[in-house]
């Protein structure tokens, strides 16, 4: 197999800031024409034939797309070398004259149940087998919007059409705001969407890296460099640098112009002393009505280190609301989001790291509202080296009455080193009454991998769960555990779940 063609520093910085890249496979046009014909046969005239999550066995040629060196290199670069494919797959048709979709984010946990990742943990590939110019209804994305949960302001963050040539694909951050655009032509437009998950925390760059400096040439409409620089350093496994900054326009923090507020925040974020000096003003910006400013301010506060912790912890502790989110699908972000200040604070505390752990543990155990406890669980998961105390607290949180808290605690355990306590807690969580908690537990066990051998009996049962994603993650977990016992548990399920791509209504045997 040809070696993956990794992204460059410039491409990675574009992805971090903009949230997407346009790339093209190396496969010939004849391959893409064949895929187009198969897609047309499946859903070109009858959406009822859409194979949904069975797309890959229905069109096994698509495995060549994911074996392509450009695709493998892009995914290796943004989600690490041992990424896995999510069990959800989607084939989308944009027929002639089809209306545009609403701008949305995808979700399996409900719109606000799970805290959205800023770090590059999930990515999507949107592949098209035909040329997709603007008039044919490409995917539209809002550059830089992966760092906000509320729908972006159109005037501040304009949409970009992800136009692609034949065999092209969009690589997007899972949490970017996007939509299907209107097809003005008489031609069909097909797009398939696959999702990929990081399985290991980065300790070094996984792309073609040569220059540690942040040198983004063309930023998106809103400059969140306080956020971007930290994502860059996290992906490199590198510490954040303290850079003395002269002539900071601190008055810009109070400007009515959002670009001036961001410019001041970004300058302050580069310098520890400046962040300490302007901490009260930054803390006030956590409640800015524009979410990008609140988020950028939280990252700038992280530059102040432990000095910023009381302000950030107080914002989370002061959120006493219950985290009720019955919406299980995508949402257009139009409803009010009172949890924005506390969520922004959680991102800042995650960046501060280990000094924030005691305060977060207290909120996780004693927070008056489930939203605060959820945010504490999330931030603890993002912080490396929380130790036995952190793992034990997250294990206890698996018993929280709020499904949102349990889901975030379960996910956090998957980001920690393997431990008997975590594996036991996750094995029990695979039987949680909430389906999202169950599939999050199976994914966390997959991330732990060989250290989760004790979970084999629970994972064997999970293969037959009524929720379609629990078995998908259980398969990944058993494969990654890879002991003879894990393989013996896995093979009978795979044999009965086998799909024959050669069988159709026209040829049933």
For each of these PLM feature ranges, what is it?
Residues 256-257, 289-290, 319-321, 337-338, ...:
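Short inter-helical turns and helix N-cap capping residues of alpha-solenoid HEAT/ARM repeat scaffolds
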Residues 99-163:
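Catalytic core of non-heme Fe(II) oxygenases with the double-stranded beta-helix
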Residues 164-178:
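Conserved metal-binding segment of the jelly-roll/cupin
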Residues 1-114:
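Non-heme Fe(II)-dependent double-stranded beta-helix
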Residues 181-251, 258-275:
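Non-heme Fe(II)/2-oxoglutarate
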Residues 222-242, 259-274, 284, 292-307, ...:
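Structural detector for internal amphipathic alpha-helices that build alpha-solenoid repeat scaffolds
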């Amino acid at each position: 197999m040809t070696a993956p063609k990794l992204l460059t520093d410039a491409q990675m910085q574009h992805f971090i800031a903009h949230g997407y890249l346009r790339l093209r496979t190396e496969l010939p046009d004849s391959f893409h024409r064949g895929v187009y014909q198969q897609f047309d046969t499946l859903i070109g005239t009858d959406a009822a034939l859409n194979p949904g999550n069975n797309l890959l066995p229905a069109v096994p040629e698509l495995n060549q797309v994911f074996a392509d060196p450009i695709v493998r290199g892009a995914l290796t670069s943004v989600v690490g070398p041992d990424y896995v494919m999510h069990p959800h797959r989607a084939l989308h048709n944009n027929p002639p004259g089809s209306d545009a979709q609403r701008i949305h984010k995808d979700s399996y946990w409900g719109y606000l149940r799970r805290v959205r990742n800023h770090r590059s943990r999930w990515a999507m590939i949107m592949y098209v087998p035909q040329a997709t110019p603007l008039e044919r209804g490409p995917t539209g994305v809002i550059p830089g919007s992966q760092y906000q949960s509320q729908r972006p302001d159109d005037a501040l963050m304009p949409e970009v059409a992800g136009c692609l040539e034949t065999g092209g694909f969009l690589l997007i951050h899972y949490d970017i705001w996007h939509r299907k655009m209107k097809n003005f032509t008489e031609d069909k437009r097909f797009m398939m969407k696959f999702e990929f998950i990081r399985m290991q925390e980065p300790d070094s760059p996984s792309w073609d890296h040569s220059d540690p400096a942040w040198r983004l040439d063309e930023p998106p409409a809103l400059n969140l460099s306080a956020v971007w620089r930290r994502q860059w350093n996290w992906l490199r496994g590198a510490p954040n640098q303290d850079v003395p900054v002269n002539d900071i326009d601190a008055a810009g923090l109070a400007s009515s112009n959002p670009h001036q507020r961001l410019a001041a925040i970004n300058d302050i974020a580069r310098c520890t002393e400046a962040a300490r000096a302007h901490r009260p003003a930054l803390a006030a910006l956590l409640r800015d009505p524009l979410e990008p400013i609140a988020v950028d301010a939280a990252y700038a506060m992280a530059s102040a280190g432990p000095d910023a912790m009381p302000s950030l912890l107080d914002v989370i502790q002061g959120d006493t609301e219950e985290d009720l989110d019955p919406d299980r699908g995508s949402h257009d972000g139009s409803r009010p989001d009172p949890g924005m200040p506390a969520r922004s604070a959680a991102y800042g505390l995650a960046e501060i790291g280990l000094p924030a752990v005691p305060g977060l543990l207290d909120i996780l155990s004693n927070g008056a509202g489930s939203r605060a406890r959820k945010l504490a669980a999330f931030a603890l998961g993002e912080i490396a080296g929380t130790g036995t105390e952190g793992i034990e607290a997250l294990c206890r949180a698996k018993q929280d009455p709020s499904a949102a808290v349990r889901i975030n605690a379960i996910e956090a355990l998957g980001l920690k080193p393997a431990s008997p306590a975590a594996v036991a807690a996750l094995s029990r969580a695979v039987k949680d009454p909430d389906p999202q908690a169950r599939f999050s537990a199976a994914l966390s066990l997959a991330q732990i991998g060989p250290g989760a051998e004790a979970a084999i009996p629970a994972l064997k049962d999970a293969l037959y769960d009524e929720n379609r994603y629990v078995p998908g993650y259980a398969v990944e977990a058993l494969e990654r555990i890879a002991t003879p016992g894990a393989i013996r548990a896995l093979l009978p399920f795979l044999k009965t779940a086998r799909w024959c791509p050669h069988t159709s209504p026209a040829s049933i045997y």
